[in-house]
Amino acid sequence: EKASSGTMTPEMHYQYINFTIAALKDIYLSNRYVRYVTVFQNWLNQAGASFDHLHKQLVAIDGVSASNAAEFEMARVNPNMYNDYAVNYAGYQNLVFAENEYAVAFADFGHRYPTLAIYSKAEKNQPWNQTPEQVRGMSDLVHACHAAMGSEVPCNEEWYYRPPAIDIAVPWHILIKWRISNPAGFEAVTKIFVNTIDPWTLRDKVVNRLFE
């Protein structure tokens, strides 16, 4: 079995997350021109990894992307947006499959690929400002998701949070996207992306694996 995030012990994964957060904070502190640091993990070749070894990447950017800027403006108009359109809606649709005192995990919707979402419940929505218990709560659910999906599923782990220059509430959340299909000509021409696993089926797959 390949050494993926899911094959770590919970403690190892927590330290891995902590190390990533420390690097994230350090980049902001060491370069005043950085406006956003994107954090991601590509697992296996189909998900963009050059080598099949575990690693996270942090990229400093001197601006906020158009997509993120639009999302932040939506959150400014509706401060409860992430509850209305994500966590609460997932609850109404019975898509939540794991929760602890500090975070909640659910089968997400609206993505090109089957996606698991893990949202922090912490009031402070920058990872480096959260308590060790809050970080561990996030880490435990992210680790559980990786363990449930196994090491043979190519995926992208993407981090989202409030950058220092933004003054609105953006909860720290992590998306794990299963890169199990390859968009081709149909998707390019129609802009219709066929997702072969619906959120409820994805939820059931993960729940079954968590019980094993």
Regions found by a protein language model. Give the residues of each.
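HIT superfamily nucleotide-processing domains
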Residues: 1-212
